[in-house]
């Protein structure tokens, strides 16, 4: 993935790179997944790291576990035990 993004960057004309870098410095996201990067290069690195992190979790959990993790992402854990939540899910 890193080499792919690096190759994409090299194909961009120098003037366009400068423009993207300036926009990134102003806080604009110019690379998908590069949120909060303060330069074009920083945004590329952030996007690559986020992609690798997600892939690693998917590999560790398997496809089904990864999907299940996404479904439960918004649920709070402080109010009920896992068993109580599971019982409620079975009722629905």
Curated annotation (Swiss-Prot):
Give the residue spans that cross the bilayer.
none
* Composition bias, Basic and acidic residues: 11-26, 38-71
Lineage top rank: taxon: Eukaryota
Answer yes or no on keyword Nucleotidyltransferase: no
Which organs or tissues contain this protein? Maximally expressed in dry seeds. Also present in mid-maturation embryos.
The record ties this protein, via Pfam families, to: LEA_5 (PF00477)
UniProt induction comment: By abscisic acid (ABA), osmotic stress and heat shock.
Where is the region Disordered? 1-92
In which residue ranges is the amino acid composition biased (Polar residues)?
A: 1-10
Which UniProt keywords are listed?
Stress response
Q: What does this protein do?
A: LEA proteins are late embryonic proteins abundant in higher plant seed embryos. They may play an essential role in seed survival and in controlling water exchanges during seed desiccation and imbibition.
| Similarity-based family | Belongs to the small hydrophilic plant seed protein family.
The name under which this protein is listed is 10 kDa late embryogenesis abundant protein
């Amino acid at each position: 993935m890193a080499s792919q993004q690096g190759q994409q960057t090299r194909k961009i004309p120098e003037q366009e790179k400068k423009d993207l870098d300036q926009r990134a410095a102003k806080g604009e996201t110019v690379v998908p997944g590069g949120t909060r990067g303060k330069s074009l290069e920083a945004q590329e690195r952030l996007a690559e790291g986020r992609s690798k992190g997600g892939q690693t979790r998917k590999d560790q959990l398997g496809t089904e576990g990864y999907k299940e993790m996404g479904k439960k992402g918004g649920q709070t854990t402080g109010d009920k035990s896992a068993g109580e939540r599971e019982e409620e899910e079975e009722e629905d």
